[in-house]
Every structure is written in C-alpha cells, then in structure tokens.
Amino acid sequence: MKFTFVTLFQNIVEGYFNDSILKRAIQKEILEVEYLNPRDFSDSRHNKVDDSAVGGGAGMVMNPQPLFDALDELKRVDSEVHILFLTPVAKSFKQNDAKRLSKKPHIAFVSGRYEGIDERVIEKYADEVFSIGDYILTGGELPSLVICDAISRNVDGVLGNSDSLSVESFETELLEAPSFSKPEIYKNISVPSEYLKGNHSKIRSLKLALSTCKTKFFRPEQLLKHKTQLH
C-alpha cells in the first residue's frame, strides 16, 4: 500500500516512520511512503503558497495554484489515487473507515496550514474529508499521521499478530477489555484472579463483562450501538 503526504513540512511526517511497526512494514515493502511539497509547484517568484483571504478575515490561506498543480501531477502518475483532506469541520474518522480504506492501493493526505486550504482545492480533488476531533491544530500533518497509522495497522502483514485486531476497541462497538502484564501482583495490586486460573471460557466471559463495564463508564453511546447490533 502506498501513502503520499502532500505537505509543506515533510520533516514533521517522515520522523514518524523511523521506528517500530510502520518502519518494519516499509522495510518489508508492505507500505510505501512518499512526499509531495506544494511549494515545489508554486509559480510565484519566491515559491509562495499562501495569500490573504478574499472577503477579509484573519490569517493567510493556502492558495489554489500550487495545490492544483501538485495534485494534478499526483493524479497524472496514478489516476486511481484516493485523496483525503483533513479539517475539523468534517465528519469524524472512525475505525470502520480505517478498515475500509486499508483496501485502497494508494492514499494521499493533503495537509493544510495557516488558516486552511482554499475551498476550491477541496471541492475539486477531495475523495473524502475527515476530522479527528472537535479541536484546532496548527496543521494537517498530525491528523494525517493519525489516520495513516489507523489505516496501516489494518493492512495485511503490518501487525505481527493479526488476531489482535479482532479484540480491539470498536470492533464490536465495545471498548477493549483491560490488559495486564507481569508481575501478577505489583505494590499489592493484583491482576483479576480469573485471569490466572487458565480457564479460557471464564476468562472470555470476564473480559466481556469488563469490556461492557468500561464502555458503559467511558462511552455509553457505544454500548447502545452494541445492543442495537445484537438485535
């Protein structure tokens, strides 16, 4: 699977792929990552990529020309590339989106800066637009990485143990049950005794109960979705 990051700040993004699971996936050629800088496509004398907002307003807006040319080149090389834009005004990215998008062969993330991207770019090139939450960041690179990570771990071969995907939060609308490590007792705090007895049927039942309690406490709306799903 190939990811293209359309960004003014490649250094912010590429460091994320220098360690751990995604680095290994790149080394195994399961994932491929490339970068496209809109500044390289600017036709202004000083490679300018932003301008003041038409109609007034604070701050600068990424102007259309560099992004139009960059994305035209991207689509010229691969007409099937799936282009994502990240903005807090869009729908929230969900686990089901990560699973669905993991089947795409090539995804591009367009990262905004300043006060955002000229809307004409989004209207022309966006296949999908997502938000990662109701808050504002200084740029789109971090949201792009969040979504890229969520997608990547659903790509076959990226995780060492693919079974771990099936028990994670949101796979059944319930949050994942609590996890514990060794030692079994630490500072007088013990792992639930049922975990230690080796009865896998009872362990599964306990995990389901703990998962349900956790969901009810932290995300009650997810519990309602789970009950609806059962019916």
From Swiss-Prot:
Homodimer. SUPFAM superfamilies: alpha/beta knot (SSF75217). Coiled coil: none annotated. Belongs to the RNA methyltransferase TrmD family. It catalyses: guanosine(37) in tRNA + S-adenosyl-L-methionine = N(1)-methylguanosine(37) in tRNA + S-adenosyl-L-homocysteine + H(+). It comes from Sulfurimonas denitrificans (strain ATCC 33889 / DSM 1251). It is an enzyme of class 2 (transferase). Specifically methylates guanosine-37 in various tRNAs. S-adenosyl-L-methionine binds at residues 112, 132-137. This is tRNA (guanine-N(1)-)-methyltransferase. It holds the Pfam family tRNA_m1G_MT. GO terms for molecular function: tRNA (guanine(37)-N1)-methyltransferase activity. GO terms for cellular component: cytosol. Its main location: cytoplasm.
